[in-house]
From Swiss-Prot:
Keywords attached to this entry: Cytoplasm, Glycolysis, Lyase, Magnesium, Metal-binding, Secreted
Subcellular location(s) of the protein: Cytoplasm; Secreted; Cell surface
Gene name in the database record: eno
Known cofactor(s): Mg(2+)
Protein name: Enolase
Role of this protein: Catalyzes the reversible conversion of 2-phosphoglycerate (2-PG) into phosphoenolpyruvate (PEP). It is essential for the degradation of carbohydrates via glycolysis.
UniProt pathway: Carbohydrate degradation; glycolysis; pyruvate from D-glyceraldehyde 3-phosphate: step 4/5
UniProt-listed Gene3D superfamilies: Enolase-like C-terminal domain (3.20.20.120), Enolase-like, N-terminal domain (3.30.390.10)
PANTHER family: ENOLASE
Principal location class: cytoplasm
GO biological process, one term: glycolytic process
Length: 426
């Protein structure tokens, strides 16, 4: 039995140049686990609290020294001597120590950093890769990468409302093949943009961020790039969206493409998109508090396309249960820092999968070189992962880890492919 001997934390930088928390956990057998915490740009109002210092004279108020101090001064003394394999008790001890419903005292960034570092240390102590430690012998499904190759919304400085336009290589036989297809489309998209005199500047997640006249124009450009790369839209490579609609929901209406639209009008818009394009997934199509609109949308097109709750569910089992009971949405986006501990994340995934919801393991727009989510995706047989474009090392790090996992699994590896999207009829 390996016990927790010491816990240390520090401030490091994320991919946007903002501070974040990194934690190291030392076990009694000498093994060390390390984890760094991501940060979102478009955050749901129901997410656990990311503790920032607020000192405008240091990192423009975005320092995380308070969270670092919480790890060193409060969490560490409370966890010394715990069995590192008892993840649930460790996470619960931190939740109890915090004592708030949203981890607002210690900070979800402090608690999550320790939670993930403990798991990494325990896996090292067991001489197992993290995905096998967490998922056991059944952890063998490689996820379809939802690759964000064109950015709009709060991830880019452009007139495109939808935040992410993604490609999903559903027709590939293996993860490595699917990744290659995605990379080839990404480079072909750059060539298409250059040919049309459009910007090839990058957004937060490595996707291109051109100024386009409409959201449909973005989908048309991506389909052109897919064809130029030698693939067939809908058969080889499908499309997916993250609308992040809470970002443009103002005063009871969706401020979309220059108009103020109702939930019913937005639903009609999405129904047209699903009819016109090979869309397998639409994330956050409506506001995080618009449960009535979400229910209507699910009833309208939920049998044809994956409808993903990100801001709606914030990886929270309580909010997810509300969705399940009302048959609202049909997929859960899984972001470890939304709920703030590994145990609660795995509980949410388990609840979703038992209830017939698909799951997508996801990064945040502010990322680090930490690859824990790649292992979580395989450990939970999620079938899908969102970790940005095949560019920028903080995104590519996760893809490279999945390549290593696929190689290690060898003949046992199975690529989720088209089966990850059971509602897609294209």
């Amino acid at each position: 039995m390996a016990l927790i001997d010491a816990i240390h934390a520090r401030e490091i930088l994320d991919s946007r140049g903002n501070p974040t928390v990194e934690v190291e956990v030392l076990l009694s057998d000498g093994q060390i686990g390390r984890a760094a915490v991501p940060s979102g740009a478009s955050t749901g109002e129901h997410e656990a609290v990311e503790l920032r210092d607020g000192d405008k004279g240091r990192y423009l108020g975005k320092g995380v020294q308070k969270a670092v101090d919480a790890v060193i001064d409060e969490i560490s003394p409370a966890l010394i001597g715990f069995d590192a394999t008892d993840q649930r008790s460790i996470d619960q001890a931190m939740i109890d120590l915090d004592g708030t419903p949203n981890k607002g005292k210690l900070g979800a960034n402090a608690i999550l950093g320790v939670s993930l570092a403990v798991a990494n240390a325990a896996a090292a102590s067991a001489d197992l890769p993290l995905y096998k430690y967490l998922g056991g012998p059944n952890a063998h499904v490689l996820p379809v990468p939802l690759m964000n190759i064109l950015n709009g919304g709060s991830h880019a400085d452009s007139d495109v409302d939808i935040q992410e336009f993604m490609i999903a290589p559903i027709g590939a036989e293996t993860f490595s093949e699917g990744l290659r297809w995605g990379v080839e489309v990404y480079h072909n998209l750059k060539a298409v943009l250059q040919e049309k005199g459009l910007s090839t500047g990058l957004g937060d997640e490595g996707g291109f961020a051109p100024n386009l006249p409409s959201n449909r124009a973005a989908l048309d450009l991506i389909q052109e790039a897919i064809k130029n790369a030698g693939y067939t839209p809908g058969t080889d490579i499908a499309l997916a969206l993250d609308v992040a609609s809470s970002e443009f929901y103002k005063e009871g209406a969706y401020q979309f493409e220059g108009k103020a639209l109702s939930a019913t009008e937005m639903s009609a818009y999405y129904a047209e998109l699903v009819a016109d394009y090979p869309l397998v997934s639409i994330e956050d199509p409506l506001d995080e508090n618009d449960w009535e609109g979400w229910k209507t949308l699910t009833d309208t097109i939920g049998d044809k396309v994956q409808l993903v709750g990100d801001d709606l569910f914030v990886t929270n089992p309580v909010r997810l249960q509300q969705g399940i009971e009302t048959a609202t949405a049909n997929s859960l986006l899984v972001k470890v820092n939304q709920i703030g501990s590994l145990t609660e994340t795995l509980d949410a995934v388990s609840l979703a999968q038992r209830s017939g919801y698909t799951t997508i393991t996801s990064h945040r727009s502010g990322e680090t070189e930490d690859t824990t989510i790649a292992d979580i995706a395989v450990a939970t047989n999620a079938g899908q992962i969102k970790t940005g474009a095949p560019a920028r090392s903080e995104r590519v790090a996760k893809y490279n880890q999945l390549l290593r996992i696929e190689e290690e699994l060898d003949d046992a590896a199975r690529y989720a492919g088209r089966s990850a999207f059971p509602r897609f009829k294209g």
